């Protein structure tokens, strides 16, 4: 049975790593070519069906008429006269042409730990990549559907900042056309990553006005700047949306390459996901919207929606709005904003284990204030939960260790007659009340927990740049000096010494190689995960040593 146990351990090690790689295939970002630099100078485009414009606006705006075909137009450069907005958690730039958010930084989330003054940049439309949030009014009278191009909004000032003691900031952009006055209003709240984008329509034209609000996210094919593939893994980079039948539906870049998607949805949301961060447009819950994904002529990927028709009589007023979230994947906040949005923190097929683990880990952290110590306490709780199972396993291995001399005698007695040897071993196990597979059970049980915790540490933004102590300054990435993986390998070696020695020399050599193999695998795993395994091994060693000594003492006493 030792060879079976050896094979099982080796298989589980390989399977666990293959499962992680499989996760990369199913959920990871596609290896797509980076966007051409020329595309990064393209203006925010307009939806399909917009008539040819003499100002060269591109064909990004979704048409209110589903049968319309896109007009391909020459792109133009972005307006240099951007409107800057700064709150305590957001720094963004709005292009007055169309009122799109073309740049967005997250000052609370540094790009790198060694440069805390440089914020992570989520949106960018003027550098080497394209990622922006667009919105407008299309349809029969929508200003974004004009033949002369998208509206040029005016603001009272070019810079807005949320002042100390101020809880809300409102930025109004104004535009008038043919007797209709438009205000595009951005409303920000202190400490919040969600903002409201509203359109106030004042129809003084003398005739009825009609149109539709649209909102969309546009991104190029460049990689995820917030993700690391050091372990051969990558988190999901792509679009997602909510439908009545599927609260979290992913639409990858490959899916969009295959063809556009169009669905009628009541309420819901559309989002673009990357490692740790998400951007989502959230329309009113009562609105019946047309959700669409597609790829534009510059190779950018678009997901968005067009809202229901808005009618404003002559002399009347109307307002329509949507919410934009652009920030970290904080599960509690996302759940408040819209049903299913918290599922963008994607724990994969083991979500039913990962979510309770994160919930417990979060509560421990609220008491301790350090994610490293929280992982240690979590490990102790998990070990306590599996204590009866582990104890039974260690008792079985201790008895195996006690009968090792008898097994050696059987090997000497039967030599190469493996059939008789196996029969004699099974009779011995039955007589000594030993379960030869008992030592494998804890490994089988721990693997789902191990993999679920891996994805918790990989996906949860709370772990990003979270320090523990000393040289571990980020639990979400590998140990920079590989100290924890080496300690983990040492604990595996010690634990192995407590196990019964396989009677076959080849099996014994294979078992001795296992700590080295595991250490190699763990070199590039997140430090938080290795910390969990080190603590788990230390607790297992203590428990196994105690049980082994008790059984050996009882065996000696019975023999006397």
From Swiss-Prot:
Q: Kindly give the Gene3D superfamilies that the UniProt entry links to this protein.
A: 2.70.98.90
An example of a GO molecular function for this protein is: membrane insertase activity
Matches recorded under InterPro entries: Membr_insert_YidC, Membr_insert_YidC_N, YidC/ALB3/OXA1/COX18, YidC/Oxa/ALB_C, YidC_ALB_C, YidC_periplasmic_sf
Transmembrane residue ranges:
1-21, 341-361, 367-387, 437-457, 468-488, 515-535
Q: What membrane topology does the UniProt entry give?
A: Multi-pass membrane protein
Q: Name one GO cellular component term.
A: plasma membrane
Classify the source by domain of life: Bacteria
Name the UniProt key words of this record, in alphabetical order.
Cell inner membrane, Cell membrane, Chaperone, Membrane, Protein transport, Transmembrane, Transmembrane helix, Transport
Provide the residue span(s) of the region labelled Disordered.
Answer: 42-66
In which broad location class does this protein mainly occur, judging by the first location in its UniProt entry?
membrane
Pfam families reported in the protein's UniProt record: 60KD_IMP, YidC_periplas
Tell where it localizes. Answer: Cell inner membrane
Its BP terms in the Gene Ontology are: protein insertion into membrane; protein transport
Give the protein's function: Required for the insertion and/or proper folding and/or complex formation of integral membrane proteins into the membrane. Involved in integration of membrane proteins that insert both dependently and independently of the Sec translocase complex, as well as at least some lipoproteins. Aids folding of multispanning membrane proteins.
Q: Which family does it belong to?
A: Belongs to the OXA1/ALB3/YidC family. Type 1 subfamily.
Which proteins does it associate with, and in what oligomeric form? Interacts with the Sec translocase complex via SecD. Specifically interacts with transmembrane segments of nascent integral membrane proteins during membrane integration.
Q: Under what name is this protein listed?
A: Membrane protein insertase YidC
- Native species of this protein? Pseudomonas putida (strain W619)
């Amino acid at each position: 049975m030792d060879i079976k146990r050896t094979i099982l351990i080796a298989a589980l090690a390989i399977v666990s790593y293959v499962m992680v790689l499989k996760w990369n295939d199913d959920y990871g970002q596609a290896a797509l070519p980076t966007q051409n630099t020329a595309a990064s100078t393209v203006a925010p485009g307009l939806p399909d069906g917009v008539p040819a414009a003499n100002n060269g606006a591109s064909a990004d705006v979704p048409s209110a008429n589903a049968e319309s075909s896109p007009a391909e137009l020459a792109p133009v450069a972005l307006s240099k006269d951007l409107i800057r907005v700064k709150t305590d958690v957001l720094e963004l730039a709005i292009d007055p042409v169309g009122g799109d958010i073309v740049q967005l930084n997250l000052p609370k989330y540094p790009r790198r730990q060694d440069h805390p003054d440089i914020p992570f940049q989520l949106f960018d439309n003027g550098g080497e990549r394209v990622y922006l949030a667009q919105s407008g009014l299309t349809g029969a009278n929508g200003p974004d559907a004009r033949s002369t191009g998208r509206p040029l909004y005016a603001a009272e000032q070019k810079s807005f900042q949320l002042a100390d003691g101020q809880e809300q900031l409102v930025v109004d952009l104004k535009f008038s056309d043919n007797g209709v006055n438009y205000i595009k209003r951005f409303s920000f709240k202190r400490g919040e990553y969600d903002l409201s984008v509203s359109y106030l329509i004042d129809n003084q034209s003398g005739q009825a006005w009609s149109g539709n609000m649209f909102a969309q996210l546009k991104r190029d094919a460049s990689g995820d700047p917030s993700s690391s593939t050091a372990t051969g893994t990558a988190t999901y980079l792509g679009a997602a949306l909510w439908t009545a039948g599927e609260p979290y539906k992913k639409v990858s870049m490959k899916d969009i390459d295959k063809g556009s998607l169009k669905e009628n949805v009541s309420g819901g949301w559309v989002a673009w996901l990357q490692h740790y961060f998400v951007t989502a447009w959230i329309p009113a819950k009562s609105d019946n919207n047309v959700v669409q994904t597609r790829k534009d002529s510059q190779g950018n990927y678009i997901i968005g929606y067009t809202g229901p028709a808005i009618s404003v009589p002559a002399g009347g007023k109307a307002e329509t709005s949507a919410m934009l979230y652009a920030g970290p994947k904080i599960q509690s906040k996302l759940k408040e904003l819209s049903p299913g949005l918290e599922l963008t923190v994607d724990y994969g097929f083991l979500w039913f284990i990962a979510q309770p683990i994160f919930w417990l880990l979060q509560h421990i952290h609220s008491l301790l204030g350090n994610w490293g110590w929280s992982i240690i306490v979590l490990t102790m709780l998990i070990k306590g939960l599996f204590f009866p199972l582990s104890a039974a396993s260690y008792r079985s291995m201790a008895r195996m260790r006690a009968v090792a001399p008898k097994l050696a005698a059987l090997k000497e007695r039967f030599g190469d007659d493996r059939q008789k040897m196996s029969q004699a071993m099974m009779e011995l196990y039955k007589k000594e009340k030993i379960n030869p597979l008992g030592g494998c059970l804890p490994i089988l049980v721990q693997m789902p927990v191990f993999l679920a915790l891996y994805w918790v540490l990989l996906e949860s933004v709370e772990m990003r740049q979270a320090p523990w102590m000393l040289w571990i300054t980020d639990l979400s990435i590998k140990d920079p000096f590989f100290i924890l993986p080496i300690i983990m390998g040492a604990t595996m070696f010690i634990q192995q010494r407590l196990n019964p020695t396989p009677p076959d020399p080849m099996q014994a050599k294979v078992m001795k190689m296992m700590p080295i193999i595991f250490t190699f695998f763990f070199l590039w795993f997140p430090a938080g995960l290795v910390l969990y395994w080190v603590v788990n091994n230390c607790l297992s060693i203590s428990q196994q040593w105690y049980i082994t000594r008790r059984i050996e003492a009882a065996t000696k006493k019975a023999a006397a």
